[in-house]
A protein has these predicted regions:
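An N-terminal assembly and electron-transfer interface module characteristic of large anaerobic redox
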Residues: 1-240
Length: 240
């Protein structure tokens, strides 16, 4: 039997499908080999059209896990300090909230974080955005600041973080300029009677970071020895 005969004998068929699994609307090519086996091509993920075996166990949602690790923290202060520090659930707080939460609570301050993002709140405050081509996370920050203002916190903490913590011996850990300086935009267009604290911070150098934390917290009436102990715990939590 020749190869041409085998190819002509084959009952292979193909058809075009349109995946409705998300807004990408991928065009999928389905090849049916006539023996119960099929092959899909053109898909950008394998959520609905997969060439591998279907797992019996549903995979974990890494974003839900990260969100829980970052923000599911009990607010238990070590004293009866009445100061409520508001922190926006936005921008670099998705990396640094464990550090600041631990530092402040160990110093006896109450940490109040803004609520989860939602589109209706975003639309309500998007008019405050100064530039249309700014990134979406920055645009979203305005609704989180408004949320903290509505919670009537005593102060809003939005540090001017120039350098992030270095990893893997890279030469530079310079922060995104928008993330670094967006507090200046907030202060210009969203000012209120609630103070906006924007201390300069660098996570690249431990000694510098400790001094910056001491400068800020002593201005709030926290004693140096308490800050130093809290700093050690905040470091450990940030590295965990």
């Amino acid at each position: 039997v020749s190869l041409d005969d085998l190819l002509n004998f084959s009952s292979n068929t193909s058809k075009t499908l349109n995946c409705k699994g998300c807004e990408n609307n991928c065009t999928i090519r389905c090849y049916d080999f006539g023996n119960g086996r099929r092959y899909f091509s053109g898909n950008r993920c394998e959520k609905h059209f997969t060439n591998g075996e279907t797992s019996k166990k549903k995979g974990d949602n890494i974003y839900e896990i990260k969100n829980k690790l970052l923000f599911s923290r009990t607010i238990e202060t070590k004293s009866q300090h009445k100061l409520n520090i508001g922190i926006a659930r936005a921008l670099n707080m998705f990396e640094e909230f464990p550090f600041w939460h631990t530092l402040f609570t160990e110093c006896g301050l109450n940490v109040i974080i803004s609520d989860d993002s939602n589109f209706s709140e975003y639309e309500k405050y998007v008019r405050m955005v100064m530039s249309d081509n700014i990134c979406f996370p920055a645009k979203l920050t305005h609704s989180h600041i408004a949320n903290l203002q509505n919670k009537k916190v005593d102060r809003i903490f939005m540090p001017f973080v120039i350098y992030e913590k270095g990893e893997n011996n890279e030469q530079n850990s310079y922060n995104c300029p928008i993330v670094t300086a967006y507090s200046t935009v907030i202060g210009s267009v969203q000012a209120s009677d609630i103070p906006l604290d924007t201390p300069t911070i660098s996570f690249r150098n431990r000694e510098t970071l400790l001094k910056q934390c001491l400068d800020y917290l002593t201005s709030l009436g926290i004693k140096k020895d308490i800050i130093e102990k809290a700093f050690l715990k905040a470091e450990a939590e940030h590295a965990r």
